[in-house]
Every structure is written in structure tokens, then in C-alpha cells.
Curated annotation (Swiss-Prot):
SUPFAM superfamilies: Prokaryotic lipoproteins and lipoprotein localization factors. The gene is lolB. PROSITE patterns: PROKAR_LIPOPROTEIN. NCBIfam families: lolB. This is Outer-membrane lipoprotein LolB. A lipid is attached at C18 (S-diacylglycerol cysteine).
Amino acid sequence: MFLRHCITFTLIALLAGCAGFGSKEAVQGQGNPQLWRQHKQQLSGLDGWQINGKVGIRAPRDSGSGTLFWLQRQDYYDIRLAGPLGRGAARLTGRPGGVMLEVANQGRFEADSPEALLEEQLGWRLPVSHLVWWVRGLPAPDSKSQLTLDGDSRLARLTQDGWQVEYLSYIEQNGYWLPERLKLHGENIDVTLVVKDWQPRQLGH
């Protein structure tokens, strides 16, 4: 079950890509809206990164933790998850129009989109969409969001499409202030992400 939740976590990351932003935002909190807009503009141009970290998942009948590697190069992604004590591993690679999932001891699966792969392999229909934005500390651009800013005009809390994201700490890397620790709360599932190493890149278009 933990591996299934890990696969779900990776799939959440892949729909929005690195397109422009323009969501309908309701902003509150301590921060300065103008500084937030400047921060958002900078991060929206960040279209490449490498992340190493840990992920923890808690669900009604299952919980666990594992390691995360995430390589993003514009619309190409390579996301790898490994469970504790080597119990299982999954690798998801692809770009728009083609996705491949490799699961240890289970095989290789392909689909046209992450959503299709999730439904085909796990039988779940979930709002697979926004983590590629959320991991940068941004709301996804194509739906309404409620934002709470911290005293540094960065996201402290985000509510969007039935999910709540809490930003617990940030780290500065290569001139970018990026989330270091965040918690995601969805329907019957909680995810904690701790980034141990951020390597951001602006690759251009």
C-alpha cells in the first residue's frame, strides 16, 4: 500500500508543467502583495531542478516514508521513489503525451498521461495536477486558490482544489527562496515532503 501512495505522490507532480500563471487568487496574511507578485514572477521562470529529499505518507490504513529524487527539465521529468528498507521502488519518466512507470518486481507501464496511468494501474480518480507548482511555493495557475502569506511575502498556507498545503520552512538556493519542508493535506491522505538538497535551474524556453 505504501508504494501505491508513493506512486500517487509522484503522479500529482506532472500535469501542470511549467506554463505561465494566472490563477484567481485570494490573498491574505502578513506579507506584501507586491513583493509576493515579484517572488511569484521569479519562481514561475524556474523550469528546471533536481531535488533530493524524503517523503512521508499517512493514510487511514497505511503509512510510511521513503526517499525522493526528482529531476525536472522543462516538460521532461524523472521522479524516483524508494520505500524504507528497500521494500519497493518506483520510477516515473516522461513528458506531455507519454509517461512510463517502472515498479520494482511488478513491471513497466505506459500511458498518454499521468492521470491515465494512475487510473489504469491503481483504479483511482484523483485531481492529479499541482505539485510541480506547489513544490516551488506557487499556486497552480488554472484554478482558484486561497493564499496566506508569511512575513517574508512567501506562501505560508495554500488551499486549492480540495488540498491544503502548509509551508513550514524555506531555504535560499542560487538566488531563489524555495520550500524546504511542506505538508499536503488531501481527502484521507497526508503527505510530508522534506527537501534535503535543492538544485534550481532556469533553462529558458
